[in-house]
């Protein structure tokens, strides 16, 4: 019989982070310990996506209020701005900023799909197959891309965790923006809002704002801080962390596109320079604060969705999001622990759930 030291064996190619499957004892006991128990990742994806939709409606209402409160451009002139003085005004550049966002949206979806393929490869599911094999196309879209130099994160469930981090950061930033744009009304810069149109149907305008992400609705005065800059920077951070794991070129490409988008926003005079700078700082700080965690969003954010009676289960199945692990013991150590267990049974009339779980996972080797 071969003897091994006490250790954990994982499936080939999988290296789980420490405490990937928290023990039962960690979340038993006090109320706050139970509140810190992570929700299933699938539940977080669904509920935080619903939260994002709700926040989008809140922002749409805030944009409506801001439009009505905006100072009259005929009376209040634009504020002095160093960016306006250094950059020549190019009215059509705002369209290019939208194009930059559209390009990054597509690239982020592609990256998220590649992260999903990495997850499948990690758990041993292999590459998916198309109904009809198209030479070159199938290999490009369905092959696993991995830049090992930038891969320092556990790949299991990485696509789900990345989406949770992205959507929660975006929701927090939009919710804070809803408050900021209403609190202080700044004079419109030298853009199309110098002659703001009247909103005839507020409800329709709110719905259009949500459905078109602001592109098909009327809103002026939402200056501090820039929503376009938020999404540009959020894509930048997403690819700086996760895109670089797929391909090394994503970092420089997205950085150039984001910087060009910032330039377009200021050069078109749709935002003051401070609107852009504050949005960049807040987005980077929020994305870092939310962080990447095997449990998904920080437990403080999960408190806002923990009480929901719908949209997913509130208890985590061990096999859903966790790393399957087999624990091996030396035979003499297992005999000794079984003796301790029998002694506790005679003395206390039973054992705890955690002890039972541990010995069920034990194996002779």
UniProtKB/Swiss-Prot annotation:
Residues 66-92, 187-229, 273-275 are lumenal. The keyword Kinase applies. Belongs to the sphingomyelin synthase family. Pfam families: PAP2_C. It is found in: Golgi apparatus membrane. It comes from Trypanosoma brucei brucei. The chain crosses the membrane at residues 45-65, 93-113, 166-186, 230-250, 252-272, 276-296. Its EC number is 2.7.8.-, 2.7.8.27. It is a multi-pass membrane protein. Keywords: Golgi apparatus, Kinase, Lipid metabolism, Membrane, Sphingolipid metabolism, Transferase, Transmembrane, Transmembrane helix. This is Phosphatidylcholine:ceramide cholinephosphotransferase 4. The active site is at 228, 271, 275. Disruption phenotype: Elevated ceramide levels and growth arrest; cells were arrested in division but replication of DNA and organelles continued giving rise to cells containing multiple nuclei, kinetoplasts and flagella. Residues 1-44, 114-165, 251, 297-365 are cytoplasmic.
């Amino acid at each position: 019989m071969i003897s091994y030291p006490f250790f954990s064996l994982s499936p080939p190619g999988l290296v789980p982070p420490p405490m990937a499957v928290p023990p039962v004892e960690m979340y038993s006991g006090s109320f706050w310990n139970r509140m810190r128990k992570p929700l299933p990742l699938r539940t977080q994806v669904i509920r935080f996506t619903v939260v994002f939709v709700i926040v989008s409606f809140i922002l749409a209402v805030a944009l409506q209020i801001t439009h009505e409160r905006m100072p009259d451009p005929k009376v209040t002139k634009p504020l002095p701005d160093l960016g306006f003085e250094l950059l020549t005004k190019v009215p059509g550049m705002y369209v290019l900023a939208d194009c930059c966002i559209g390009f990054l949206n597509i690239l982020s979806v592609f990256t998220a799909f590649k992260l999903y393929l990495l997850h499948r490869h990690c758990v041993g599911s292999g590459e998916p197959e198309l109904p009809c094999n198209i030479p070159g196309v199938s290999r490009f879209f369905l092959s696993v891309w991995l830049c090992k130099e930038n891969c320092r994160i556990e790949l299991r469930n990485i696509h789900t965790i990345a989406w949770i981090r992205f959507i929660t950061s975006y929701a927090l930033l939009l919710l804070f923006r809803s408050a900021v744009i209403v609190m202080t009304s700044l004079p419109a810069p030298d853009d199309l809002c110098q002659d703001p149109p009247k909103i005839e149907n507020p409800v329709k305008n709110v719905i259009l704002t949500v459905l078109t992400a602001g592109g098909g609705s009327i809103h002026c005065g939402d200056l501090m801080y820039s929503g376009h800059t938020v999404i540009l920077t959020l894509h930048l951070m997403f690819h700086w962390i996760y895109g670089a794991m797929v391909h090394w070129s994503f970092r420089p490409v997205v950085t150039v596109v984001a910087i060009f988008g910032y330039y377009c926003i200021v050069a078109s005079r749709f935002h003051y320079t401070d609107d852009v700078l504050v949005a960049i700082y807040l987005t980077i700080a929020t994305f870092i604060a939310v962080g990447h965690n095997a449990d998904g969003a920080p437990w403080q954010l999960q408190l806002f969705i923990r009480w929901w009676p719908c949209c997913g289960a509130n208890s985590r199945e061990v096999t859903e999001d966790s790393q399957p692990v087999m624990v091996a013991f030396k035979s003499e150590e297992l005999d000794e622990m079984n003796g301790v267990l029998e002694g506790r049974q005679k003395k206390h009339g039973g054992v705890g759930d955690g002890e039972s779980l541990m010995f069920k996972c034990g194996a002779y080797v």
